[in-house]
Amino acid sequence: MPEKKEVVVRTVGVEKNFMLGRIELKVLKGIDLEINQGEYISIMGPSGSGKTTLFNMIGGLDKPSNGRVYIDEVDVAQLDAFELAWLRCRKIGYIFQTFNLIPVMTALENVTLPMIFAGTSHDESVDKGRQLLELVGLGERIQHKPFELSGGQQQRVAIARAFANSPAIILADEPTGNLDLKTGKEIIGLLKEMNRKQGVSVITATHDLKMLDISDRVIWIRDGQIERIENRADLNIQVGEVEGE
């Protein structure tokens, strides 16, 4: 009998509504989903499909209008502001399309900052920050500030920062959106390598078909609902052909 995997994210009947003037806009319409420890998941769909809203629900950046979101079986909606901040700091690492590095800080300082916020000592934070930057291939750039780094290098710093507090989940919102094709492929490969080495669940919201090659499952969202969920082995898309290679 195969070993049952631990569920790190579970959504039950998640709905999200927004008011547009006097009109109620239903963005998510009852999302039921389970994501296991160590999985690499891509959430894909057209603009306006609800994938970014679902991404924000999973990350504790917003709360559902109805339904429940559980992170490690903790109901996110029941947490107060302090508890939610602790959860986001310790359980979740974030990677953004626009990198969101602090421009006056070095690469090392950007990576150590989440650890300092979490109460890790300065020396331990610096040691781990160096190790993470080495791991993402920036061991020689730790004292460089963001403006001294290329877009791909800045995203590598952002990836190292996301892993700073040894999270259970990495949320990557369009992580290749601001990168050229070659650099985007390098970042995708790095994310998969970190996923495999660290055993962390990676969840991406993306339009990038290159993500299909490394995802364990792809969740297709359309009109606020899960249209289908496909395992990598079941996908028929040949990414090389899509990219014109």
Predicted regions and their residues:
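H-loop (His-switch) and adjacent beta-strand-loop-beta switch element
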Residues: 218-230
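ABC-family P-loop ATPase nucleotide-binding domain
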Residues: 1-17, 228-245
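Residue-level detector of flexible, active-site-proximal loop/helix-junction positions
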Residues: 83, 225, 233
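ABC family nucleotide-binding domain
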Residues: 7-221
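Flexible, glycine-rich phosphate/dinucleotide-binding loops
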Residues: 188, 211, 227, 235-236
